[in-house]
Structure formats: C-alpha cells, structure tokens
Amino acid sequence: MSTAGGGRRCQAQVSRRISFSASHRLYSKFLSDEENLKLFGKCSNPNGHGHNYKVVVTVHGEIDPATGMVMNLADLKKYMEEAIMQPLDHKNLDMDVPYFADVVSTTENVAVYIWDNLQKVLPVGVLYKVKLYETDNNIVVYKGE
C-alpha cells in the first residue's frame, strides 16, 4: 500500500461550497428605530430583505494513508446539509432561527452560528474555517476565534 507523500505524514485542507437563500432584518433591540436606521440603513427595513448566501467550509487534517483523504467529501456534504441547509435555507433568520432572537443577524453572526452548528456534527478538531459570502463583495471569514 502506498502512503500519502511517499510515507510522510501530510496535512491538507479540504473545502466544499454550498449556497442558501434567507431573509433577515438588521436590527438591534438595544437601539432605537432611528439609531438602527442610521447604523444599518436600508438593511433595517421593517419588512426585511434577502440574500443568496454562499458558504465555503474548510476542514483540515492528516491525509489518511489508506483512503488518500482528509475527509470524504460526501460526508462533508451531509454535515453541511445538517448544520447549514436544514436550519437556514429559505428561512427568515430573525423569525425562524431561535439563535437570532437575541443576536443581530449580521453576516459575522451568521458565520459564527454556522461554525457552532458544524462543530456539533463534524469530527472533533477538523473544522478550520467558515467563509460566508453575503454578496460577491461582502465576505466574512470565521475560524472559531
């Protein structure tokens, strides 16, 4: 049997991307309506607005000499479906996701939510990075720090 890297212990990062659609309103209950409007602008519209988010999840670890993989991408897809798609896709984040009842649904906080959910389903220690695209120009990277 051949091993990864000719017998060396090789580390690698593996990423998978998915997309989900969700609506939300940027609004802090600690601020007045006027302050929210000043801070969040049109994103504080009382009727909300939506995004087609893209998420890139990166895991890391040693390349298994028997399989040649850090993680089977089919398994990563299942974990992402459970941790991201089921709770977030086609949802109003503020109304349908209990986490956001007390947390402003900024892209930063959505990335933290995704990280926390993935940590619950992935093997311990493999999650490396969550990269969340709210738009092509607005991107948040979260590494659990």
Curated annotation (Swiss-Prot):
Residues annotated as binding Zn(2+): H24, H49, H51
Cellular component terms per the entry's GO annotation: cytosol; mitochondrion
Enzyme class per UniProt: lyase
Family per record: Belongs to the PTPS family.
EC annotation from Swiss-Prot or TrEMBL: 4.2.3.12
Organism: Pongo abelii (Sumatran orangutan)
Catalytic activity: 7,8-dihydroneopterin 3'-triphosphate = 6-pyruvoyl-5,6,7,8-tetrahydropterin + triphosphate + H(+)
Gene Ontology terms for molecular function: 6-pyruvoyltetrahydropterin synthase activity; identical protein binding; metal ion binding
Name by which UniProt lists this protein: 6-pyruvoyl tetrahydrobiopterin synthase
Pathway the protein acts in: Cofactor biosynthesis; tetrahydrobiopterin biosynthesis; tetrahydrobiopterin from 7,8-dihydroneopterin triphosphate: step 1/3
Phosphoserine: residues bearing it: S19, S28
Cofactor remark from the record: Binds 1 zinc ion per subunit.
Coiled-coil region: none
Record PTM text: Phosphorylation of Ser-19 is required for maximal enzyme activity.
Keyword Ligase: no
